[in-house]
Every structure is written in structure tokens, then in C-alpha cells.
Amino acid sequence: MTIYHFVGIKGTGMSALAQVLHDMKCVVQGSDYDKRFFTQEALEARGIPIFPFSAQNIRENMVVIAGNAFPDTHEEIVAARELGVPVIRYHQFLGDFLQKFTSIAVTGAHGKTSTTGLLAHVMQGAKPTSYLIGDGSGKGREGSEYFVFEACEYRRHFLAYSPDYAIMTNIDFDHPDYFANIEDVFSAFQQMAWQVKKGIIACGDDEYLQKIQAKVPVVFYGFGEDNDFQARNIVKTPEGTSFDVFVRHTFFASFHIPRYGDHNVLNALAVIALCHYEGIDVNIIQERLKTFPGVKRRFHEKMLGSQVLIDDYAHHPTEIRATIEAARQKYPERQIVAIFQPHTYTRTQTFLDEFAESLSLADAVYLCDIFSSAREHQGKLSIEDLRAKIEGAKLLDEEQVDVLKQHDNAVLIFMGAGDIQKFQEKYEQSVHV
């Protein structure tokens, strides 16, 4: 009996893949650091064992799936090679695995996770569908016809995939520790486009995606007149967003989503276009769009006394802007307070002015110290460099979070890709004391 052992099982993609294999009746286990991570809940709910890192975890009857954050010198990977146990990197394993299904990759600088989650939710209403989402969620269904998965451009990992379809949400300059500039990012997406086997659904409002070439049909969606799928007559309320969809200038149907901001209309349009292409009944699409519960760490709301607390993964200026605008749509009468933890020195340095500009859309700004990634050690700048560019911005220390209590009846948005959640947790504890 083969055991699939995940080195770094708490990673968002790794956790999701482990869940998919477990659901498909594979024997799964993994190892990681002791520190608690939000992906653990789903693993623990399935009874998937999680061990501390140790060479002793590796046995001969295993296939080792290695997370991208761990080098070949990691003790478990070394032990596996010494035993002659296969070691497969996450994206390579996934690339082979998805060949069993009609596969749909969702990629783009922003909106990948929300769009993957939404597509999986809608498709499940029509066909047996398995999915892997970048928020750490995965679901495997035996006999699945479709496999919906998030494909990340970082280090060109998505080139390990040759999907049947690709949804491309946008192209933007991110991951400056790897990509040289926007042209470098575009070249990665162009390489990915050549590998798609049936069709590409791309946002036609994005100037770079308009230039994408492919061997398969490219269907464009967006707000602009030239798109194959166009959203018109958009109505935004505190309850959500309604819009009409026109397919090549002919009315198709009306839709409502309990979501906020233009970016969520675009995400829904991408899903509508893909489902239309695959012949899924419009009534199913309409109903499923209304019932989408959202994905983890994307505009996740909770009430705390008179305040609304929102947890969001936004870590790029474009995402911060979209999140603040979404909060304004839902809570037009409330003060919007941004609490932001920059993620990586490289990204903070590269987008310093853009971060200042997007955060300034909030009514008040608090900044937490820069969270450095496993890939970097230290940077030349400090959080003070960003604070100096935002009028009235204050630095927030984990031990002084109760200063947020002064924002009565406000919306507090905790944003970042590091461990910003610990600030929110500390604040919630301080309120309950």
C-alpha cells in the first residue's frame, strides 16, 4: 500500500492536494513545523496525520510530495533519496494528476483563489467536480469529470500544467523577488497559454491579456464593449451586485452575486463564460452564484460589538484597493480602517509608493512590521519608510492593539499574506477581557 507523504503539508496548495488524495481513498500523511497554521483544520477534520519534520518519517512504501519552500537538502527529502523513495515536487505531481480529468486551471496575478472557489462551487451544481483552491481547501470526488485548480505563476510553476482550459484573470507585476518586470510576467503567461489544450477564458479589459496568443480559442470577458462576454447594467447595493451578461452583444441572462466590488463581477463573468462554453444550464449558474459562501481569508467578516472585522489576504496594492472599495460598497456609512502587514521586503520596496496610494483610500491606517518570507532574510527598508508616505498612518504593535477600540462602529480590515491574523486575534481577546 502506497502512502503519500507531504513534506510541508500545511502549505496552502499542499494541504489542499492532501485533502483531494485522501477523499479519493489514498493513504495520506505529512510533516511540517509545529506552528499552528489555518490550513490545519481541514487536515485534522479528515484525520490526516501531521508529524514534526524528521528523517524517521520516511519509509520505503511511500511517495514523497515535496513543497516548493523546502530545498533538496531538507532532511526528509535526503532520507527519501537514500531509501530510493520517489520524491516529486508539488507542481509536478499536480501536473500529472490533473491529466485524469477535464482540467480547468485558474491563473492570474489577482483573483485566482476567489475565482477557483466560485468556479468549483458552480460546477459542482452541474457535474461531479474535484477542486484544489489556494486557500488550503481541496475536495476529491471519485468519478469526477472535472478538476478545477488554482495555478500560480510564481517561479513559473504553472508551466508544469497542460490543462484543458485556463481562466486568466489578469496580468500584473508581482513577486518582484523572481520576475524582473511586467514583460517577464507576461512571457510566463504566454508560455502557459501555449500549453492549454481546449480553450482560454481571459479578461479582455486587461491590456496584457489582449496580447495573449494561443493554439486554442480565446474567449474574452469584461466590462468593455469588445469582449465576448460583457457585464452591463451593474447595480451595486449593500446586499451585493446585480448585472446583465451579453454574449457577443446579445442578451444572455441576469445574475446576482452576494459580493462586492468590480473585481467580483469580473470573477463571476469568468465563471459564467467557462460554464457557457461547457454547456452548463444557465439556471444552475444563476442559483449557484447566489449561494457561494466565499473562500478563506478573502473578505472574511465577523461582528465584534459595534465593529465589523474583515480578514483579507490582500498583499498587493491592486488587491488592497479592491478590498477597501468592496468594504465601502457594503458599508457606505461606516469608517474604513486599514490594518496592513506588508509581505516581504522585496515587494514592499518595489511597490512602496503604490502601497501608500492604495492604503490612503481608507479613513485610517495602521501598519504592522514587515513579514519576511522564508525566501529572504532581511531588507534594507523598514515599515517606517511606508508610514512616512501615508498621512496620519500609525504603527501597530501586537501588544497595543487595543488602540483600535477607539474606532467605534467602524470596519476594521486586517490585510496581509503573513501572520496578520495574530493581530486580529489579539484584538478580539483584548475586547473580550
From Swiss-Prot:
Pathway: Cell wall biogenesis; peptidoglycan biosynthesis. Its EC number is 6.3.2.8. GO terms for molecular function: ATP binding; UDP-N-acetylmuramate-L-alanine ligase activity. GO terms for biological process: cell division; cell wall organization; peptidoglycan biosynthetic process; regulation of cell shape. InterPro entries: Mur-like_cat_sf, Mur_ligase_C, Mur_ligase_C_dom_sf, Mur_ligase_cen, Mur_ligase_N, MurCDEF_pg_biosynth, UDP-N-AcMur_Ala_ligase_MurC. GO terms for cellular component: cytoplasm. Keywords: ATP-binding, Cell cycle, Cell division, Cell shape, Cell wall biogenesis/degradation, Cytoplasm, Ligase, Nucleotide-binding, Peptidoglycan synthesis. ATP binds at residues 108-114. HAMAP family: MurC (MF_00046). This is UDP-N-acetylmuramate--L-alanine ligase. It comes from Anoxybacillus flavithermus (strain DSM 21510 / WK1).
